[in-house]
Amino acid sequence: MLAWALLSAVLWSLAGVGSARSSLFSNEGFVYGTVGHPVKIYVKLHQTSPVLVCMDIDRASKETVDPIYLWIGPNENTLTGSSQINITNIGELVLKDFMESLSGHYSCTLSYKIVKAETQEETSLKKKYDFLVFAYREPDYSYRMAVRFTTKSCVGRYNDLLFRLLKKILDNLISDLLCHVIEPSYKCHSVKIPERDFVYELFVAFQVNPFAPGWKSMCNSSMDCEDVTNHNILKARDRIEEFFRSQAYILHHHFNITVPAMHFVDHSFQVTRIDNCRPGFGKNEGLHSNCASCCVVCSPGTFSPDMDVTCQTCVSAHVYGAKACP
């Protein structure tokens, strides 16, 4: 409340007075194969995958005689148990502490028999199931915001003073969250109000992101750092929104007839979320429609070197999650 009152008081003194994810996911967390069609699965970084079942749903509902399961991993190697790979005796695969390098094509071949009870005649059958497993992480959120303030004129030093003061107040408001205001700018325009004369208004725009100096210190105890930074930026967004809402309240309830010549324009606050992906990850709604909002690991043949949202083409990138084009 102190920040809100401070800005209103300074505005008054500055300018005087004016006029007023998988399609085959079961409820139990099991993913079944489909003969002839690879099943796409998305696993959050450092988390555990769902259970990949070496059967289709129809086969799983029937008796299976003498089943043998053979899992092949992304490097065409036969999978065996390890700290990150767990294969049960009924052919179920679980991937733990999922990393970019675990992404890729997994296949399982199910061999089984059909036995005629009357003759004991055996028929051997095989079915192959393909799974495409991708690491993903949540996008990093930032916010683009815009507000307007009335002003007496488009010339003079008061507009710059207001602009610098506003940035300082907003930075102080969210500094404990290690968020900050970046790329601030403003332009002054003359605006014709319906049934009123022209007024001068400052169109202020800025971004808020959760990467103020020292932000990494908040991630020391979390593997999913974007969960921490996204939580902080959401709180920062709410604080800033409440700040401008309070500016409107103060204007309407504390200034009555006489209002500052420079004041917040009610209902002018706008906010838009911007998503960014960490290096090695990107968005592709066409390729990953089941995880369209996710930052999915860049596939071989692509890379992402920065916080962009797309993976760029690179024919010499042969691994998942490439951050450079060799």
Curated annotation (Swiss-Prot):
GO biological process, one term: acrosome assembly
InterPro entries: Sp38-bd, ZPBP1/2_C, ZPBP1/2_N
Disulfide bonds: none
Subcellular location as annotated: Secreted; Cytoplasmic vesicle, Secretory vesicle, Acrosome
Pfam families assigned to the protein according to its UniProt record, in alphabetical order: EGF_Sp38_C, Sp38
Maturation and modification: N-glycosylated.
Record keyword Glycoprotein present: yes
Keyword Glycoprotein annotated: yes
Signal peptide per UniProt: 1-20
GO cellular component, one term: acrosomal vesicle
Glycosylation sites: N86, N220, N256
Keywords of this entry: Cytoplasmic vesicle, Glycoprotein, Secreted, Signal
Family (UniProt): Belongs to the zona pellucida-binding protein Sp38 family.
PANTHER family with a match to the protein in the record: ZONA PELLUCIDA BINDING PROTEIN SP38 (PTHR15443), ZONA PELLUCIDA-BINDING PROTEIN 2 (PTHR15443:SF4)
Record function comment: Is implicated in sperm-oocyte interaction during fertilization.
Protein name: Zona pellucida-binding protein 2
Gene that produces this protein: Zpbp2
